[in-house]
Regions:
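Positively charged n-region of N-terminal signal peptides that target proteins for export
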Residues: 1-6
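Bacterial N-terminal signal peptides
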Residues: 9-19
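Sec/Tat signal peptide C-region and signal peptidase I cleavage site
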Residues: 21-25
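Activation targets extended, charge/polar-rich intrinsically disordered C-terminal tails
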Residues: 27-30, 154-371, 376-381, 389-447
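Early extracytoplasmic/domain-onset interaction patches
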Residues: 28, 33, 40-50, 54-63
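Glycine-rich catalytic cores of cysteine/serine-nucleophile enzymes that process amide/ester linkages
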Residues: 52-130
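Second-shell loop/turn segments in exported
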Residues: 64-65, 131-139, 158-167
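Short, charged, amphipathic alpha-helices and their helix-cap/turn boundaries
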Residues: 143-152
Length: 447
């Protein structure tokens, strides 16, 4: 019941926004002489005076322990002290229960939507998850507040509330940013397409570095486009990055003290401009984050696999045996993950289409595994091993443009060593040599 009371109050506030805007527009349209113009101007000022009691704040939330929450969250807070309403505007609403959710997520077809609900519920949710919440109250004029409120109202309409989520380009953080910047005009000093020295991969490493397996999964799926330098505007795809830019944001226009929150004296940024953030406070204080305590890391697994591959290859050479079954296992184990990388080519997720790690975890291994093992079992050479050797060389060279997942280079080197040795062994094997002699003899006879 309490939730519906808050929602009803929020809807009532939106209705008042539209009514006051329409009244002001009608009065201003009848402004035909100077006396009436002055009178209507006063009416317009009085009609929007209630906006002085409205505070709009940027909410930045710390990371959680779930994989999807490692990177934090962004929302807006709309507080009307006169009406007693206090709501959170959240662009991160989604449902796991939607049909084919996992499949849709893999292919970048996940839909998120805007949600507006009581601020008390928002705080309770993040307090329960043990995540910090920082509030930055924004310094806005009445016109800007009105513009933001009307934009939120429009975005919350049934036909507009759902959007196609994109981790880098269109997420809860970028939505909140655009909602604010689109209504303050060209008055800012930051938020430009200024080149940086960072990349998308480096930025997410700052937040998943303590979660080695999550970082491995991200690095495995992200392609070479995640390693290009990004701009300052692209850098703001993460909640904490946007919060930092808001904290140093300067405004090139002068805002009168009467139009700022609580009539405080305008603060200035390091550049001498008036700051966009009026006040910063911690709703839920930050505390020590629980990090991954998994003793087994991806690199440890890669080293163990490399030792097994090299050890088996050496034993094979010393014993002069042909462990074709071991190669069958390797082809299947490296081919199955390759199916995921192949599927990423058709995904709508950004930066995953061109991924050179597919040359290491190659889905073609599943296609040629049977034919390759069949010929190896008979002691005959098969060209596919030589092809794999060249592909692995190319993959190692491509690390100039792409950072691979932890341990992938170690795996690639061990596989390359084995395939080179196997190709040489097949060339020198008696069965293969006898087959070559038989082919030559038959060719000469026909000739």
């Amino acid at each position: 019941m309490k939730r519906f009371k808050h929602i009803f109050s929020a809807i009532l506030a939106v209705i008042l926004i539209n009514l006051t805007t329409e009244v002001a527009a009608q009065d201003f349209s009848r402004d035909k002489d100077s006396d009436i113009s002055v009178q209507n101007s006063r009416v317009n000022e009085e009609a929007t005076a209630w906006l002085d009691s409205v505070d709009i704040s940027l909410l930045t939330c710390g990371p959680g322990q779930e994989v999807w929450s490692y990177y934090g969250h962004t929302a807006l807070r709309i507080q009307n002290k006169a009406m007693g309403t206090d709501v959170a505007v959240n662009w991160g609403m989604f449902s796991f229960n939607k049909s084919c959710f996992v499949l849709r997520f893999v292919f970048g077809l996940t839909d998120y939507q805007i949600g507006i609900y009581p601020m008390s519920d928002f705080i309770a949710e993040y307090a329960h998850e043990g995540r910090w919440v920082r509030q930055q109250r924004l310094r806005l004029s009445r016109t800007e507040k009105l513009g933001i409120l009307r934009s939120i109202d429009k975005n919350a309409q049934p036909e507009n509330r759902v959007y196609r989520y994109n981790f880098f380009y269109d997420n809860c953080t970028t939505r909140a940013r655009e909602m604010i910047l689109s209504n303050i005009g060209n008055q800012s000093t930051n938020f430009k397409d200024i080149p940086t020295t960072s990349t998308y991969r480096e930025e997410i490493h700052k937040l998943n570095g303590q979660h080695r397996w999550a970082r491995f999964g991200n690095d495995l799926l992200l392609g070479c486009q995640a390693d290009r330098p990004i701009t300052q505007r692209e850098w703001e795809f993460l909640p904490d990055n946007l919060s930092k830019d808001f904290a140093t944001e300067g405004r090139t226009d002068f805002i009168d003290a009467s139009q700022t929150a609580d009539g405080k004296t305008n603060a200035t940024s390091a550049s001498g401009y008036i700051t966009l953030v009026d006040e910063t406070s911690d709703i839920i204080p930050a505390r020590a984050q629980i990090t991954d305590d998994t003793p087994v890391t991806p690199q440890m697994i890669a080293i163990a696999l490399a030792l097994i591959i090299i050890g088996t290859t050496v034993r094979e050479c010393v014993k002069k045996k042909n462990y074709w079954w071991f190669d069958a296992i390797l082809l299947v184990l490296t081919g199955l993950p390759g199916l995921i990388l192949f599927a990423m080519i058709f995904s709508q997720h950004p930066t995953v289409q061109i991924n050179f790690q597919i040359l290491i975890l190659n889905p073609l291994n599943l296609i040629f595994a049977w034919k390759t093992v069949k010929r190896m079992k008979a002691g005959r050479q098969y060209w596919y091993f030589e092809l794999l050797g060249w592909l692995l060389l190319i993959a190692l060279f491509m690390q100039i443009w792409q950072n691979y997942a932890e341990g992938m280079s170690i795996l690639a080197l061990s596989l390359l060593a084995r395939y080179c040795v196997k190709s040489t062994m097949m060339d020198l094997s008696p069965n293969n040599y006898g087959l070559q002699k038989h082919i030559v003899k038959k060719f000469r006879k026909n000739k």
